[in-house]
């Protein structure tokens, strides 16, 4: 019985801390090729969501066996600003939430853009959520030790 309660409290703490992760509303792709229509206007993929910087990007496939390399899907109808898009065989490597890699003769830069569109949250809400998650985790740990 004590083990079940401890396990339940630990699951609650882990769930609370996972909800505190920063979310991203979109990511931008810029292109260094002077002949590309992307060079003056960044490709803004608003339909995509970065779950974490270089962690998991919707419509971008992770390379097997790597947590930092991703392959682009065809942007297709999602992309209205740029006709010249990379194919699914092209890769980029993330470093600290930003990435630049030469694909052929073109360098693509990928940057995750934090989601600040929720009007009920202020800029300080991230630190508040992290603090609350830490407090929940500490409470769960103390409860487990008391059992």
From Swiss-Prot:
Keyword Nucleotide-binding assigned: no
UniProtKB keywords: Cell membrane, Glycoprotein, GPI-anchor, Lipoprotein, Membrane, Signal
Lipid-conjugated positions (GPI-like-anchor amidated asparagine): 118
Topology versus the membrane: Lipid-anchor; GPI-anchor
Main location: membrane
N-terminal signal peptide: 1-20
Entry-listed glycosylation sites: 118
Cell compartments where the protein resides: Cell membrane
Post-translational modification: The GPI-like-anchor contains a phosphoceramide group, rather than a phosphatidyl group.
GO CC terms, sorted: lamellar body; membrane; plasma membrane; side of membrane
Annotated TM spans: none
Protein name in UniProt: Ponticulin-like protein C3
